[in-house]
């Protein structure tokens, strides 16, 4: 004879089946609210979610409901994240809602306006809290999809403007339910790298709904808490996201973000050449000016007068020569100082400068070695020196302490 179950046992069995199903444990649903009830004493919300053909009961407990940014009501279309389980006492399966927001352009707009007001009141968008973008960046962190056009555009412009810049990528989805958490985690990850000097976060444009991940409070919070300056590059020239408002600098496109991130080294070189030419022309003008003065003096009658008059003019000429010499020396010293400062700034950016002091660049399969954990015994490494490249094999590995912490 087959086992006979009680009603409670059957309901519990069905509940266990639903609770163990990974698909039913994390669902995103869209539907219309009907029969909405808020119990003031408990704070729990009960309603029916429906579409044109079906309905399902739903509950949102107080611990989740108090985090809502809007007031649910009948007839409102919503997007929610929930799990499916059975209320065993009644044998009724229903949704247990974890997160809910208005759906559709109108609903999203109202939701974002309320969130924007809340964040503005906390000072998230205040201009005085925004960090300055560094002038000479050597290492840029990027939070975006590794497969997107945005990453290719950013890297292309970075290499055009500054061939020596290094890129650190934190891969993330840029749309969908997982995107907000991944974007926020990418920002936190890049903040853990002390070498990263600037972060670009963004995507290659899209519809208003596609950009919703960059309106997430999770992402806004992560940008606000970043210790590293952040440039937003959502790729939409008209619509501003909340990420744009909280970022230290907003770029209309990923390409523009890359242009804002690093200095144009070719332009700097041209500027130095221009300074040199201006200095030379200024000196030539001064020399011509005083030469003409001397020539005019030489043409005057004084040179035909007795020796006493000639002596007086000789003294004047001597004074003029001294003035000319001092003036030109001062101009030359000032221009030379400016030129030296600009040349030093440019020269300090060159990796070859470090190699001149006897240092080398150690690489493994094209990647720079920064930590002994990247190297194993038997690895073949490439050594870049000032005037030669070597290939070596690791035969011994020993951790040593070079200086006191």
From Swiss-Prot:
InterPro entries per the UniProt record, alphabetical: Exonuc_VII_L, Exonuc_VII_lsu_C, OB-fold_nuc-bd_dom
One of the Pfam families matching this protein, by short name: Exonuc_VII_L
GO biological process terms on file: DNA catabolic process
Gene Ontology cellular component list: cytoplasm; exodeoxyribonuclease VII complex
Compartment(s): Cytoplasm
CDD domains according to UniProt: ExoVII_LU_OBF
Keyword list, A-Z: Cytoplasm, Exonuclease, Hydrolase, Nuclease
Known EC number: 3.1.11.6
Molecular function terms, GO-annotated: exodeoxyribonuclease VII activity; nucleic acid binding
Reaction catalysed by this enzyme: Exonucleolytic cleavage in either 5'- to 3'- or 3'- to 5'-direction to yield nucleoside 5'-phosphates
Signal peptide: none
Transmembrane domains' residue ranges: none
Function: Bidirectionally degrades single-stranded DNA into large acid-insoluble oligonucleotides, which are then degraded further into small acid-soluble oligonucleotides.
Family as reported in the entry's similarity comment: Belongs to the XseA family.
Subunit description: Heterooligomer composed of large and small subunits.
Protein name, as recorded: Exodeoxyribonuclease 7 large subunit
